[in-house]
Design a protein with these regions (language model features):
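FAD-binding beta-loop-beta segment adjacent to the flavin cofactor pocket
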Residues: 386-395, 447-474, 478-481
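Short beta-strand to alpha-helix junction loop
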Residues: 75-82, 159-163, 174, 216-240, ...
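N-terminal glycine-rich dinucleotide-binding loop that anchors FAD/FMN and/or NAD(P) in oxidoreductases
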Residues: 62-87
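A conserved FAD-binding loop/helix module that cradles the flavin
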Residues: 479-501, 505
């Protein structure tokens, strides 16, 4: 692994002979780019992975704060996330992100709590006993809670008509009161779609509900990382890519993609189809204590500079695995149908905010919980994963809780001090032991553009992996994966990009098959 600015020059295989493996540059080191790079390297390509930040992982990353390992955002996955689980297996990390034996979520409200736990019944019957006893719904609401579940089974998430409807309107039409939508349906849709349930695309919500809640009985079982995300994804990916012979260049921001005429080269060595030109990386992170996770490096004050500002990498193929705004700037305008690039900007963005609270004593024994009738949405115990349990002074029993706030438009610009005034009392309402505890530390991380805005009409704006230019493909959870903007969607997009390259460049010296990481495409 090479950090740009180090002593090693940019390396590439040189001119490509008629039977040489293809040279592929993957731009972007998030989950989509990591997945594409692994799949292509396993297929025999010479792969160079470029990442503007000083580490891999994209939005799923970690940084260190006063000896504490902090994830910029809390991420979980479900049993139905087969592509992501396949990636964990490739990285050797399955044991470090274990799935629950059975879906089991504690739901908190001030002064009350409930438990949603699936039974051993086959899907979709496995959740019915828990819903029938769910105390946060009235008897009348529980009597009709199965209506949308039954109706949802007949929906096709790929139907364009569903993408024109709001999930909240559809639930209301199927007998779900405003209270029922907040107390039950929003628990899952808001965190999965990063938008208020009432405002979400029905097509994307249907994917979540049908696949996660109405599919196999174990489809909604929750997996929670037991390692910091930087170790789970970025470090493990760097190790695997090195073993596969791929090059990883960090601090390498791409400024432009130049398209060549491959036939214009002299002699028997055709020119590369693309030249990837490098620029300087993004600027510094936000102030300590209030980290903007959208910045280039939330762990340090300044990102490293690129050592070769005029560098360029030749490539026979390019995987563009960056956020949709960056992709629109980098894609050569002649490669896509008129208006396609401009339509990406209409995808917009939704923020996620994480509120981090360290208490001087334990306040709960729950590993995680959801909440209703509270500004808290989900809360996670990060005492062990952050290293706090091992590194605090002798005799100290501090506990570190992280609140994950999806669809956080109302909070993303609120100062940390104001968020403290709101969320410390909210935690005390949910955890009585917190009322007598002292807050040892409080800080906030913000992902301003965590996902695209998954509102009605958004599915229609998502492009496929392929472009009009053979050899240039798109990846990212914002592309048309059939899934919402999640870790699963990101991994599926990387696989789709790798498969598309093989499909459109059959003459290259690929290995027998491209990895699908156990997923049917």
């Amino acid at each position: 692994m090479t950090a740009a600015g180090g002593a090693a020059p940019w390396e590439h295989p040189g001119p490509r002979g008629p039977e040489a493996p293809p040279r592929v540059v993957v731009i972007g080191g998030g989950l989509a780019g990591i997945t594409a790079a692994i799949a292509l390297a396993e297929s025999g390509a010479h792969v160079a992975l470029l990442e503007a930040r000083p580490r891999l992982g994209g939005a799923t990353c970690s940084f260190t704060r006063d000896g504490l390992v902090v994830d910029t955002g809390q991420h979980i996955y479900l049993g139905c996330c087969t592509a992501y689980r396949g990636l964990l297996g490739k990285l050797g990390m399955t044991a470090h992100a274990p799935l629950q034996p059975r879906f089991d979520v504690t739901v908190l409200a001030p002064g009350r709590q409930a438990r949603l736990r699936r039974t051993a019944l086959p899907g979709p019957l496995h959740m019915l006993p828990a819903l029938a006893r769910y105390p946060f719904l009235s008897l009348a609401e529980r009597a009709v809670v199965s209506r949308p579940a039954l109706a949802m089974r007949g929906l096709d998430p790929a139907d364009p008509a569903l993408d024109t409807q709001r999930f909240g309107d559809w639930l209301a039409a199927h007998g779900q009161s405003t209270h029922a939508r907040r107390a039950l349906w929003d628990l899952f849709s808001v965190s999965a779609l990063n938008i208020a349930g009432d405002d979400a695309s029905l097509a994307l919500a249907a994917t979540v509900v049908k696949t996660g809640l109405l599919g196999r009985s174990n489809a909604a079982d929750i997996g929670v990382p037991a390692l910091p995300l930087g170790e789970l994804h970025g470090d493990a990916a760097a190790t695997l890519l090195a073993k596969l012979g791929a090059q990883v260049h960090l601090g390498a921001k791409v400024g432009a993609i130049e398209v060549n005429d491959p036939a214009a080269g002299p002699g028997t060595s055709p020119r590369p189809r693309f030249l990837v030109h490098l620029a300087r990386p993004a600027g510094p992170a936000g102030p300590a204590g209030d980290v903007d996770a959208s910045s280039a490096d939330p762990a340090t004050a300044t990102a490293p500079e690129v050592g070769y500002p005029a560098a360029q990498l030749p490539a026979d193929a390019v995987v563009l695995a960056v956020p949709h705004e960056a992709a629109a700037r980098l894609v050569p305008p002649t490669t896509l149908p008129v208006g396609t690039v401009n339509s990406w900007s209409a995808l917009g963005a939704s923020p996620i905010v994480n509120v981090h609270v360290i208490y001087d004593r334990p306040v709960t024994d729950l590993p995680f919980a959801a909440a209703i009738d509270s500004p808290v949405q989900w809360v996670f115990d990060r005492t062990a994963i952050s290293g706090l349990a091992l590194n605090q002074p002798a005799g100290s029993r501090q506990q570190y809780l992280a609140i994950s706030l999806s669809a956080a438009d109302d909070y993303v610009d609120v100062p940390a001090a104001k968020l403290r005034e709101r969320f410390v009392p909210a935690l005390a309402d949910l955890f009585p032991a917190a009322r007598d505890a002292q807050v040892a530390e409080f800080f906030v991380t913000r992902e301003r553009r965590a996902t695209f805005r998954q509102a009605p009409g958004s599915n229609a704006l998502r492009p496929k992996a392929g472009t009009r230019l053979p050899g240039l493909v798109l990846a990212g959870a914002w592309t048309d994966t059939g899934w919402p903007d999640t870790m699963e969607g990101a991994v599926r997009s990387g696989l789709a990009a790798a498969i598309e390259l093989r499909r459109t460049d059959p003459g290259s010296e690929w290995n027998a098959s491209t990895s699908t990481m156990g997923v049917r495409q």
